[in-house]
């Protein structure tokens, strides 16, 4: 009986480990097309977390000043596994974590549109596609590497949930216009 229990637990662990796959890279769009706005209460953003890992901000820190454990932990988490300065510089950038939910079964596209300091009003965009999405989801986007080093910080952003070619949920930064 104990052997059967151990085998069942091992099988369950293998199945659950297969479900916990990391998100692949987001699809970058050449041009963000304009879509009609038809907000629907069945789709909503719950929370959006933004963080910046910028070498210039690190250098501006006063030596010996306390930044708090959370900021230092976030910086250490972003650079975990980087073995040289090139790998660390590829991880500098803006990070977005979006928590959203839907109460309907539908194919949902999550889009992050953003402007960067060096590009003025030009809008960049990244997308993730979720077939038959229902329930709560956590998705991440990042603007890092050469894109960040050449074009600068993300100065404004907006997140969209798109279903059947229409915007059903929207959240934006205060700088978006």
Q: PLM features: residue spans?
A:
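Short proline/glycine- and polar residue-rich coil/turn motifs
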Residues: 129-137
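Contiguous beta-strand segments within globular domains
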Residues: 64-102, 138-143
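Bacterial Sec signal peptide processing site at the extreme N-terminus
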Residues: 17-35
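Short beta-strand elements
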Residues: 166-177
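Mature extracytoplasmic domains of secretory-pathway proteins
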Residues: 86-124, 131-132
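Internal, hydrophobic beta-strand segments that form the core of beta-sheet-rich folds
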Residues: 153-167
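Bacterial N-terminal signal peptides
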Residues: 6-17
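Post-signal-peptide N-terminal segment of Sec-exported extracytoplasmic proteins
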Residues: 40-75
């Amino acid at each position: 009986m104990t052997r059967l229990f151990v085998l069942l637990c091992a099988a369950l662990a293998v199945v659950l480990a297969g479900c916990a796959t990391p998100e692949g890279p987001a699809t970058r769009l050449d041009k963000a097309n304009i879509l009609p706005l038809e907000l629907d209460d069945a789709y909503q953003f719950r929370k959006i977390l933004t963080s910046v890992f910028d070498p210039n901000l690190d250098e501006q820190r006063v030596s010996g000043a306390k930044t708090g454990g959370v900021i230092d932990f976030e910086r250490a988490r972003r650079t975990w596994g980087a073995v040289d300065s090139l790998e660390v510089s590829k991880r500098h950038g803006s990070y977005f974590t979006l928590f959203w939910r839907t109460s309907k079964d539908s194919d949902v596209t999550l889009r992050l549109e953003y402007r960067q300091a060096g590009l003025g009003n030009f809008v960049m965009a990244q997308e993730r596609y979720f077939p038959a999405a229902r329930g709560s989801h956590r998705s991440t986007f990042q603007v890092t590497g050469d894109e960040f080093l050449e074009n600068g910080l993300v100065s404004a952003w907006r997140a969209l949930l798109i279903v059947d070619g229409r915007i059903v949920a929207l959240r934006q930064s205060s700088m978006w216009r």
